[in-house]
Amino acid sequence: MSLAQVKTIGTSTDIRSDKYLLRQKYPQRHFHYSLKDFFSFQTNSGTIDDWNESRNILVSENFIIGLIAGLEEEVGDASGVLMYNIGQQWGQEDAKFFRSWFLKEYGYDDFSQLNLMYVLEAWWWPFIAQGWGNWEVDMSDQKNGFMFINIFDSAVARTLGDVGKPVCHIYAGLFAGFFSDLINKDLG
C-alpha cells in the first residue's frame, strides 16, 4: 500500500473513510483479507484494529530479533519452552474466539460436521493478513490421526534466518493449543 492510497479524515488517517466502513457496507463479506480491507489504521489514537475489531501492532524485524535474543539471554534454553507455552495459551484462547466468530460469521450452529479444511482456512486467513505466514496442510495421514502443517513466509523464521535450530516455538504452541481445543483433547 502506498501513501497515495491512504486518505486523511480530519485528524485520523485511515485506509477506509470510516472505521469498519467495509464491514458495515458488506456485513456478510468473507473475503476481506487485503491490507486495505482487513486493517483500520487510526492515527489520532495510534491504534490499528482488524476486521474483527481486535487490536494489532506492527513490529519490525529488529523487534522480533531483540525479543527472542532478550528472552534467550534472560531464561537461556528455556526460552523455547516459554514461547511454546505462550503460543499454546494463545491457541486455546483463539480457538474459543474462533468458534464463536466462525459460527456467527458463516451462520452455522456447529462446525463438527463441516469440512475440516474449510474450517482451518477460515481460521488461518487472519493470520496470513497479519503477517504470520502462509501454510500448507497435509491431511494424507489423517486416518492415522496425523496432520502436518508447513508454514511459509513465517515472520519469525524469515527474520532470524537459518540459525541451526528450530525458532518457531510460538507456532508449535499455537497449533497445539488451537487443535487441543478443537478436538477436546490435550495435544501439548
Regions found by a protein language model. Name each.
Residues 166-184:
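Active-site helix/loop of acyl-thioester processing domains in fatty-acid/polyketide metabolism
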Residues 1-148, 153-170, 188:
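N-terminal accessory segment detector
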